[in-house]
Amino acid sequence: MGNYLLRKLSCLGENQKKPKKGNPDEERKRQEMTTFERKLQDQDKKSQEVSSTSNQENENGSGSEEVCYTVINHIPHQRSSLSSNDDGYENIDSLTRKVRQFRERSETEYALLRTSVSRPCSCTHEHDYEVVFPH
């Protein structure tokens, strides 16, 4: 959409640059529009420079993006905990961050393999998950 808008503004600018006889108020409006158009083009150029720089970093492999995996191992034919008293993962105590002893019934086991520390928080609240099934 940005490119479309830029093309539209460029066409407007070319039409405005043609000398026309008319009302002095119209001429002043054209000049103001041309100034506005230049500001928009400058902003677009700056944003293109920033995006191309970030793309080059990712292509060169020097970007700070890391891939994080979480393993979820669910033992079949056994029900996981549905208790509302459990905070976070069902077999990891939220206060001590230690694995709780399994209750009499089996539960789903979770393990965080790696997390990204250097990367800033994502803009989206969605998380990517990978499901791993036992062989």
Swiss-Prot record:
Q: Where is this region: Disordered?
A: 1-68
Bias class Low complexity marks the residues at: 51-66
- Identify one Pfam family in the record: HGAL
Q: Where is the composition biased (Basic and acidic residues)?
A: 22-48
Membrane-spanning residues: none
What InterPro entries does UniProt report for this protein, alphabetically? GC_assoc_lym
Keywords noted in UniProt:
Coiled coil
Q: Which residues form a coiled coil?
A: 26-50
A Gene Ontology biological process in which this protein takes part is: regulation of lymphocyte migration
Q: Which cysteines are joined by disulfide bonds?
A: none
Q: At the top level of its lineage, which domain of life is listed?
A: Eukaryota
Q: What is this protein called?
A: Germinal center-associated signaling and motility-like protein
- What is the native source organism of this protein? Homo sapiens
